[in-house]
């Protein structure tokens, strides 16, 4: 029997581990409400305490990195709301709660409702910027929805009176705390819209706890503000207090006094602005008049300068100056022309061709004489050389030889006959005599002995 169940036997360690995993996986993170007891804080900075109610208790631990975010010091017997993870301490088998956050029990429940409503309205788009209405500038009438006996109304009226005493203010008194407050606030918003007397509404109250401000976290109030055709400025509590009404309103003011500052004009500042504008206007007028005066003076002077007599006088003066300039220019031109004429005359006198012609003629005559003499000398030399050449030629000329009785015979191809072997019997040859030529036929060839 025992052997059949051995597969289901757990060791203590395995059992505690399995239970721990089951607790962590199945339970996850939960909210626990209970009373604190046995609170301790060792040197490590961690918190150890017990949460209990009338019939049960559980051990809890809150580590230092989590408890440093808690804004209060837990006390023995204090009711708190704890967000925690359920686990088991395996070495001892003790199941315990590991706290992640802690709030006083009353505020914790309200905070949870606050977060749920905020998420719901945000998902519906009530906080979207596209739905925000612009505030009138300036406002002509301000409606105030708050308690008629609260400090908030006093602060609002004080600021409005200081900044803009002439600004009309209509008070819609309501309760701002308690069970009846949300309904009264809704009816006041609806009444202001129905009467249409104001062009901006301030909805708010002074500071307080989360429970004190809870009327402005009511869904009915939020939807009434969203539905208002008149722009709404929320002014609930202090700057650190943020309500659902602040998210839905067209503009959130950190305090009621700040809301009054936002919707009103500062008459003193407005007066200073008017005085400044008047001063700037006066300066602009002075500048404009001075500018116009300067312009008038300029035009007057221009008209005076353009008077016919003045223009005629200026033209006569200009004409006289022009005449003088023309006279000076003419004299200068004449002077320049005379100077140029003198320079040209000097250059012409320096470049007169007559002396050069005389010098050229003398040079030509000299060259002609020298050329004639040279030709004569050359001709004499040539005659002498020619005579010598003739004498020499006559001495060696064949004609002279022919005159002495000799002859010269040549073959038909023009070769001079020097030997008998150059011809044969029957050949034709030509013989040159002193006074002519003979053509003869060789009858026979006889060698000399």
Swiss-Prot record:
Its EC number(s): 3.1.11.6
One Pfam family recorded for the sequence: tRNA_anti_2
Keywords: Cytoplasm, Exonuclease, Hydrolase, Nuclease
InterPro entries (alphabetical): Exonuc_VII_L (IPR003753), Exonuc_VII_lsu_C (IPR020579), OB-fold_nuc-bd_dom (IPR025824)
First-tier enzyme category under EC: hydrolase
UniProt-annotated location(s): Cytoplasm
Single GO term (MF): exodeoxyribonuclease VII activity
One GO-annotated biological process of the protein: DNA catabolic process
Catalysed reaction equations from the record: Exonucleolytic cleavage in either 5'- to 3'- or 3'- to 5'-direction to yield nucleoside 5'-phosphates
Main subcellular location of this protein, as a coarse class: cytoplasm
Keyword Ion transport set for record: no
Gene Ontology CC terms, in alphabetical order: cytoplasm; exodeoxyribonuclease VII complex
Keyword Transport found: no
Family: Belongs to the XseA family.
Subunit structure, interactors included: Heterooligomer composed of large and small subunits.
Function of the molecule: Bidirectionally degrades single-stranded DNA into large acid-insoluble oligonucleotides, which are then degraded further into small acid-soluble oligonucleotides.
Protein name: Exodeoxyribonuclease 7 large subunit
Species of origin: Salmonella paratyphi A (strain AKU_12601)
Gene (UniProt): xseA
């Amino acid at each position: 029997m025992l052997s059949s169940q051995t597969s289901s036997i757990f060791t203590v360690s395995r059992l505690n581990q399995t239970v721990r995993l089951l607790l962590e996986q199945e339970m996850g993170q939960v909210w626990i409400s209970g009373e604190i007891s046995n609170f301790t804080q060792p040197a490590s900075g961690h918190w150890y305490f017990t949460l209990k109610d009338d019939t049960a208790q559980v051990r809890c631990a809150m580590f230092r990195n989590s408890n440093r975010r808690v804004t209060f010091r837990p006390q023995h017997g204090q009711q708190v709301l704890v967000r925690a993870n359920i686990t088991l301490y395996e070495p001892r088998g003790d199941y315990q709660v590991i706290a992640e956050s802690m709030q006083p029990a009353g505020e914790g429940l309200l905070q949870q409702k606050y977060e749920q409503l905020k998420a719901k309205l945000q998902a519906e788009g009530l906080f979207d910027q596209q739905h925000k209405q612009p505030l009138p500038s300036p406002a002509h009438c301000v409606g105030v929805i708050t308690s008629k006996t609260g400090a908030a109304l006093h602060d609002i009226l004080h600021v409005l009176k200081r900044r803009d005493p002439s600004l009309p203010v209509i008070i819609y008194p309501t309760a701002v705390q308690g069970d009846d407050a949300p309904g009264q606030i809704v009816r006041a918003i609806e009444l202001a819209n129905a009467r249409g007397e104001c062009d901006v509404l301030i909805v708010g109250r002074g500071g307080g706890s989360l429970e004190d401000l809870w009327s402005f976290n009511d869904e009915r109030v939020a939807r009434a503000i969203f539905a208002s055709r008149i722009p709404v400025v929320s002014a609930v509590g202090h700057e650190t207090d943020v309500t659902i009404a602040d998210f839905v309103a067209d503009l959130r003011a950190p305090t009621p006094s700040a809301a009054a500052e936002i919707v009103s004009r500062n008459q003193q500042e407005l007066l200073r602005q008017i005085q400044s504008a008047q001063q700037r206007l006066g300066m602009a007028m002075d500048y404009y008049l001075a500018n116009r005066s300067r312009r008038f003076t300029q035009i007057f002077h221009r008209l005076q300068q353009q008077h016919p007599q003045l223009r005629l006088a200026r033209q006569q003066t200009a004409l006289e100056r022009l005449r003088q300039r023309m006279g000076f220019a003419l004299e200068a031109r004449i002077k320049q022309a005379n100077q140029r004429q003198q320079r040209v005359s000097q250059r012409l006198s320096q470049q007169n061709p007559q002396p050069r012609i005389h010098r050229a003629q003398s040079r030509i005559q000299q060259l002609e004489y020298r050329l004639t003499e040279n030709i004569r000398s050359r001709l004499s030399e040539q005659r002498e050389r020619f005579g010598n050449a003739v004498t020499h030629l006559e001495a060696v000329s064949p004609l002279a030889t022919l005159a002495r009785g000799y002859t010269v015979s040549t073959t038909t191809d023009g070769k001079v006959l020097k030997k008998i072997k150059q011809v044969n019997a029957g050949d034709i040859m030509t013989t040159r005599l002193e006074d002519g030529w003979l053509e003869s036929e060789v009858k026979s060839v006889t060698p000399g002995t």
